[in-house]
Design a protein with these regions (language model features):
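Membrane-proximal helix-turn-helix segments that form the acceptor-binding/catalytic region
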Residues: 128-150
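Nucleotide-activated donor-binding/catalytic signature segment of Leloir-type glycosyltransferases, i.e.
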Residues: 240-256
């Protein structure tokens, strides 16, 4: 792809709401700019004040009546607003950070399927028919996209096609694995033995209370164990109560700048990730880059080299045994697969 490109990245969230999609959008923008192209990131923050909260308001109203299809409506109204206010005929390339906000255009485009809502409802009690209705709408959404659709790992693609959507997807889905700036991980620091760390949202999908129950067993076995939790979310109050109840040596750092996250990772020894669902996991990637030994559920749809020790279930004793019993060094992995440059090049190439 020759010449200087004008690229617009559309992200259907707010800049201040951190997470994997937000990180990806910003990494893409900086990576594209570093290659000499022009890149603009459009978020809900860029909409007129009276409209920027409309997608989330519509989502809540529709979900109150017809849960969980409100997520589809949120994507639809976001797409309409972005198209009205930010569609540019002089752009060379459009990147949509979600299938729900993607529209067909004569401009070269790609839609990124980080995950689908029907696979991200762990915090809710969803009836089978409700889930089926949402899946059907998502399948129709994907089939209506005329430009390439990519997802973030081979494992997640296999899960979506053969399991989640039960081979009902007719569209070809490509894979572009995510990448991050690895510069700050090159610094080596002395790791504190028995120091465990977790980074991510404190929400149902991340299974944070299970992590605390596992840590309680570890601490009762060896009082040298320490746990640092980086992140925030709706499960924080429950986590604080559990920590106080059992007087555990757990540090809750909340949301902190990314540079500080990296510094924390570099000084810990073990990364324990008790999430029940992932399609890639920046957190596991960063833990590997920082040289930590990683423990995670074997059923996650992440690159296999992200997990050093896999646990096949969510039995507390099995996690305890795995962490106590596995004293091997972290496994080596090819970090060159997960650079921003490679991610940008693959993304632009897929869109033609």
């Amino acid at each position: 792809m020759n010449g200087r490109l004008k690229v617009i990245i559309f992200y259907g969230g707010f800049k201040f709401v951190l997470g994997g999609v937000n990180s990806h959008a910003n990494a893409l923008k900086l990576g594209i700019q570093s290659m000499g192209h022009e890149a603009t990131l459009v978020t809900l923050d860029d909409l007129p004040f009276l409209l920027k909260y409309l997608p989330h308001l519509l989502e809540k109203i529709v979900n109150f009546i017809f849960f969980p299809v409100g997520y589809i409506y949120k994507g639809t109204i976001t797409k309409m607003l972005f198209k009205i206010f930010f569609a540019r005929t002089d752009a060379d390339y459009l990147i949509f950070e979600d299938i729900y906000i993607s529209w067909n255009s004569t401009i070269r485009s790609v839609a990124i399927m980080h995950a689908v809502w029907s696979d991200n409802l762990q915090a809710f009690n969803v009836a089978p028919q409700q889930l089926r209705n949402l899946k059907e709408k998502e399948i129709n959404t994907i089939h209506q996209i005329h430009h390439p659709v990519v997802t973030v790992s081979e494992q997640y693609l296999d899960f979506l096609i053969n399991n989640h959507f039960n081979r009902e997807l007719m569209s070809a889905i490509h894979v572009v694995t995510l990448g991050i700036d690895q510069t700050d991980f090159m610094v080596k620091k002395c790791k504190v033995k028995y120091a465990i760390v977790y980074t991510g949202a404190l929400e149902a999908r991340k299974n944070i209370l299970f992590l605390l129950r596992v840590f309680k067993l570890l601490y009762e076995e060896n009082s040298l164990y320490r746990l640092t939790i980086i992140g925030d979310g709706p499960e924080r109050q429950k986590a604080e109560h559990f920590i106080d109840q059992f007087k555990l040596p757990v540090t809750l750092l909340g949301r902190i700048p990314h540079q500080q996250v990296i510094q924390e990772l570099l000084t810990h020894e073990l990364y324990v990730h008790t999430s029940i669902k992932e399609s890639f996991s920046y957190a596991l990637l960063e833990a590997k880059l920082a040289g930590l030994k990683t423990f995670a559920y074997s059923g996650l749809q992440v690159p296999i080299e992200f997990i050093d020790t896999k646990i096949d279930n969510f039995d507390i004793n099995d996690w305890f045994d795995a962490i106590i019993g596995d004293q091997s060094a972290p496994k080596q992995f090819n970090s060159n697969r997960y650079t921003v440059t490679r991610m940008v090049e693959d993304t632009l190439e897929i869109g033609g």
